[in-house]
């Protein structure tokens, strides 16, 4: 996204009448910045739900402006407050872990519930400005490669590799199915309980994207390509990605030993260590 993000651009900057700037281009640039912010916020959406909601609403608003041509519409949208769109909690209608074992895409309309399809000045939003949610399932080839540590490769030290994937794609990634919980004994106890139905399925990855309808498929495809690349087994002698993870783990362990008042009391596999934060939810 670095090619789209322009640090010098300010959405609050007024256009001078003497400057022949294309307002659609200006707002397109602002939309690109909003999407870049959405990417950066990805790993923190759970702890900053209000920020995520407000950012999604602004993305919807600006997407609508970009698709309206002409200075009249642009000025009417530009110098007003964001429309007070209500956005339902995307997780309010989930039961258990919120996912059922299926292949393909699940789509959910957000932000424009029935009865609020017009903004506060009466302008209908562009259909492509709707923020939608899609979930894609990718099966992990554990049957073909039973000895390959797919989960560790995706998670990385303390889940950092997974966090970077989420930050770079703007999508959330969940590891589900048999083998998604580190402790096999705990997994056996949880299997079949409400919220853990997925443990009866083969190991799989869920990619969740939440973007305007006009771009969500492209973003989801990008995330799919990144995950599929990680799911390709590599010979250990040629696995540069794993070597990078091991170096990162060594650095984290060294930092922990220096910071801990009781050397050896902190392990990267303890609660503060190699967590499988995206499993068993």
UniProtKB/Swiss-Prot annotation:
CDD domains: KH-I_SPIN1_like
Post-translational modification: Ubiquitinated by SPL11. Ubiquitination probably leads to its subsequent degradation, thus negatively regulating flowering time control.
Gene Ontology molecular function, alphabetical: DNA binding; mRNA binding; RNA binding
Main location class: nucleus
Disulfide bridge map: none
Keywords, sorted A to Z: DNA-binding, Flowering, Nucleus, RNA-binding, Ubl conjugation
GO terms under cellular component: nucleus
Domain KH: 139-205
Biased composition annotated in UniProt, kind: Polar residues: 13-22
Comp. bias regions, Low complexity: 81-95
Domain of life: Eukaryota
Chain spans, region Disordered: 1-22, 77-126, 255-281
SMART domains assigned: KH
Keyword Ubl conjugation attributed: yes
Record localization: Nucleus
Stimuli inducing this protein: Circadian-regulated, with a peak in expression in the middle of the day under long day conditions, and from the middle of the day until night under short day conditions.
GO aspect biological process, one term: regulation of mRNA splicing, via spliceosome
Tissue: Expressed in roots, stems, leaves and panicles.
Record's function text: Involved in flowering time control. Binds DNA and RNA in vitro.
Subunit structure: Interacts (via N-terminus) with SPL11.
Protein name: KH domain-containing protein SPIN1
Originating gene: SPIN1
């Amino acid at each position: 996204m670095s090619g789209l993000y322009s640090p010098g651009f300010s959405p609050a900057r007024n256009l001078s009448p003497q400057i022949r700037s294309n307002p659609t281009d200006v707002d397109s640039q602002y939309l690109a910045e909003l999407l870049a912010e959405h990417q950066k916020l990805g790993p923190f959406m759970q702890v900053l739900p209000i920020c995520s909601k407000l950012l999604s609403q602004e993305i919807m608003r600006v997407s609508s402006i970009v698709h309206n041509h002409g200075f009249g519409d642009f000025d009417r949208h530009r110098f007003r407050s964001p429309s007070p769109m209500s956005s339902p909690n995307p997780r309010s209608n989930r039961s258990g872990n919120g996912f059922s074992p299926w292949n393909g895409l699940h789509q959910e309309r957000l932000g424009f519930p029935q009865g609020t399809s017009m903004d506060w000045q009466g302008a209908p939003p562009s259909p492509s400005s709707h923020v939608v949610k899609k979930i894609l399932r990718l099966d992990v080839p554990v049957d073909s490669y039973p000895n390959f540590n797919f989960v560790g490769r995706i998670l990385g030290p303390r889940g950092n590799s997974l966090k970077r994937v989420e930050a770079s794609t703007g999508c959330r990634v969940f590891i589900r199915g048999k083998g998604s919980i580190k402790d096999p004994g705990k997994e056996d106890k949880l299997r079949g309980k409400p919220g853990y139905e997925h443990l009866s399925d083969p190991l799989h990855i869920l990619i969740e994207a939440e973007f305007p309808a006009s771009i969500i498929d492209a973003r989801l495809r990008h995330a799919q390509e990144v995950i599929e690349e990680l799911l390709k087994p590599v010979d250990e002698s040629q696995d540069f990605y794993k070597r990078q993870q091991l170096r990162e783990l060594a650095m984290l362990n060294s930092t922990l030993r220096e910071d801990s008042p009781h050397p050896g009391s902190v392990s990267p596999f303890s609660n503060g260590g190699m967590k499988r934060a995206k499993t068993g939810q």
